[in-house]
UniProtKB/Swiss-Prot annotation:
HAMAP family: DNA_ligase (MF_00407). It comes from the Archaea. This is DNA ligase. InterPro entries: ATP-dep_DNA_ligase, DNA_ligae_ATP-dep_bac/arc, DNA_ligase_ATP-dep, DNA_ligase_ATP-dep_C, DNA_ligase_ATP-dep_cent, DNA_ligase_ATP-dep_CS, DNA_ligase_ATP-dep_N, DNA_ligase_N_sf. NCBIfam families: dnl1.
């Protein structure tokens, strides 16, 4: 069975007009009920704004604004200049294409012409979801000599056949600017309602998605085989598992108490988290954001081939840059410098790496994610053949807060960021895709009153003054609220940027600039331009404070006030983190409460 693409385009238009998550959920439920089970995966990918999961490492569409305008020019029989002028006026290529196409339709109707572009203004066309998807996939996959002309011809054909509304969303999809404001959590809930019988089944959908990070595939299994099939899903080598995340505390006594009185405490390395998969001689390496980064680490591939003794395995670790002269750890930025190099092999000796392993999730057909940490660690020790650059993370088991503190100081002295404390009781499972109190990170910034850095998402930008006039000079930052699947404003940051950072800002933000407040953004402060929540930055500040204008934790501490950061300062970009990996509103609330307790203790009178 097929489904008209117009059904999808109409839903996109509805989603674009609303900001309330409950209304978005209703529209998705309505759409999924109309969708044939055989194509639900393609519909989910379209909503996510992608053709396939990032981790598959398949080519992207490879079409920039210029090629899109050229294709539209061919399809609409108008000059590229005419389209460019309208794009400049509207700031939206998709809207410009829709407007021109609608005007041409109306003119044709007025003179009674029946051309191939004549479609009812409501948006009916002969396009199906499958045809649009398959054509876009062909555009992405075509390579080699003459590929540009083939891409152009295929895209022009799609735009010519599409209705005005369909053309708008095809153009936006191609540009990577679909921006429906729908998060994965809302998609999963809608799938649970339609195919699982109720929203309560979302936990089953989420568990499957966490183990097989392909929401389209999960949706298709659910729609064609039912909820029980999802319950039986296990990890698969070559398909990334969504990583388990940690909470944060900065008091060893509290950490030990929270973890049940005893914990495994490991170095927290300043590197890139990696999930390494092995099947025979085949190795995959996935980033924290589930991108396939295997090609960036040929040295790690060789380490894994030699160092994992199991035939099939999924292990987790941290890739850390090492000084070739001293063997000491080098900062995260050095690793990112290596990743930006086109010829990675040329810098292998200049920027060598070591891998520190801390978990194993799957071995020879056995799913270990529901096993307690000690059992997983025991398997890790059995299957890993250690060397100087491939070894298990430094760690101790302790129930003593003082021993934890001493180990933390040793970690800092050795060049680590801090430590990660982990529960080792019977319930210490691997919570794929979730942040919880089974893992707690403990790191400290000695130069600041604020006890830790935070990872915030860019939701807006402000133009600078003076020599920065006309260019971006400050950013509006937000925390993630998983309960509402929204981003709440925390602070405006304009300090800490190097000249190089500022020069790159305009180009970095350009693909994500929005002409209106994004649907998932909750902010009273209005920036000069809105930015789709995509980019993550590490921020430090003097202290957490209350603010009447920021929406993070609004009303949680005091009526009419949210939590903000006083004197925020940019530290670095976090390309390894997605927006949903950012510091959460609950984390900031807990940090604020701990700060208050610390201040009260410091101000308390001593002696008599």
């Amino acid at each position: 069975m097929s489904m008209p693409f117009s059904v999808l385009a109409e839903t996109f238009e509805k989603l674009e007009r609303v900001t309330a998550r409950t209304q978005m959920l209703l529209y998705l439920v309505e759409l999924f009920k109309k969708t044939p089970p055989e194509i639900i995966d393609k519909v989910v990918y379209f909503i996510q704004g992608k053709l396939w999961p990032d981790w598959k490492g398949l080519p992207e569409l490879g079409i920039g604004e210029k090629m899109l305008i050229k294709a539209a020019s061919i399809a609409l029989h108008v000059s590229e200049k005419q389209i460019e002028q309208l794009v400049k006026k509207l700031g939206d290529t998709g809207k410009a294409i829709e407007m021109i196409k609608r005007e041409k339709q109306q003119k044709q109707k007025a003179v009674g012409l029946l051309a191939f572009m004549q479609k009812p203004s409501g948006g009916e066309s002969t396009l199906t979801v499958e045809k649009v998807y398959d054509t876009l996939a062909r555009i992405a996959l075509v390579q080699g000599e003459g590929s540009r002309d083939i891409k152009l011809k295929l895209l022009a054909g799609l735009l010519a056949e599409a209705s005005p509304r369909e053309a708008k969303y095809i153009a936006r999809f191609v540009e990577g600017r679909l921006r429906l404001g729908v998060g994965d959590a809302t998609i999963m809930e809608a799938l649970a309602v339609v195919y699982g019988g109720s929203a309560a089944m979302r936990s089953v959908v989420e568990r499957a998605y966490n183990l097989r990070a392909d929401l389209g595939m999960v949706a298709k299994i659910l729609a064609t085989q039912g909820i029980d099939a999802l319950k039986n899903i296990k990890p698969e080598v070559g398909v990334p598992i969504r990583p388990m995340l940690a909470e944060r505390l900065n008091d060893p006594v509290e950490i030990i108490k929270k973890l049940g009185g005893r914990a495994l405490v490991e170095y927290k390395y300043d590197g890139e988290r990696a999930q390494i998969h092995k099947k025979g001689d085949k190795i995959w390496i996935f980033s924290r954001r589930l991108e396939n980064i295997t090609h960036m680490y040929p040295d790690v591939v060789e380490m894994a081939k030699k160092g994992i003794k199991a035939e099939e395995a999924i292990v987790e670790g941290e890739i850390v840059a090492i000084d070739p002269e001293t063997g000491e750890f080098r900062p995260f930025q050095v690793l990112m410098h290596r990743r930006r190099k086109k010829d990675v092999h040329a810098v292998l000796s200049e920027i060598p790496v070591a891998v520190f392993l801390f978990d194993t999730l799957y071995v020879n057909g056995e799913d270990l994610t529901l096993k307690p940490l000690p059992a997983r660690h025991e398997v890790l020790e059995k299957i890993i053949e250690q060397s100087d650059t491939w070894r298990i993370a430094e760690g101790i088991v302790t129930s003593d807060p003082q021993e934890l503190e001493s180990f933390f100081l040793k970690a800092i002295e050795d060049g680590a960021e801090g430590v990660m404390a982990k529960a080792i009781h019977d319930r210490s499972i691997y919570q794929a895709g979730a942040r919880g109190w089974l893992w707690i990170k403990y790191k400290r910034d000695y130069k600041s009153e604020m006890s830790d850095t935070v990872d915030l998402v860019v939701i807006g930008a402000f133009y600078g003054k003076g020599r920065r006039g006309g260019k971006f000079g400050a950013l509006l930052m937000a925390a993630y609220d998983p309960d509402t699947d929204t981003f709440k404003s925390v602070c405006k940051v304009g300090s800490g940027f190097t000249d190089e950072d500022l020069e790159r800002l305009d180009d970095m933000l350009k693909p994500y600039i929005s002409d209106k407040k994004p649907a998932r953004v909750d902010s009273q402060m209005k920036p000069d331009v809105w930015v789709e929540p995509t980019l993550v930055a590490e921020i430090i500040g003097a202290e957490l404070t209350l603010s009447p204008i920021h929406t993070c934790c609004y009303g949680w501490v005091k009526s009419g006030a949210g939590i903000s950061i006083r004197f925020p300062r940019f530290i670095r970009w976090r390309p390894d983190k997605g927006p949903e990996d950012a510091t959460t509103t609950k984390e900031l609330y807990e940090m604020y409460k701990r700060q208050l307790r610390r201040i009260k203790e410091e101000e308390a009178p001593t002696g008599v």
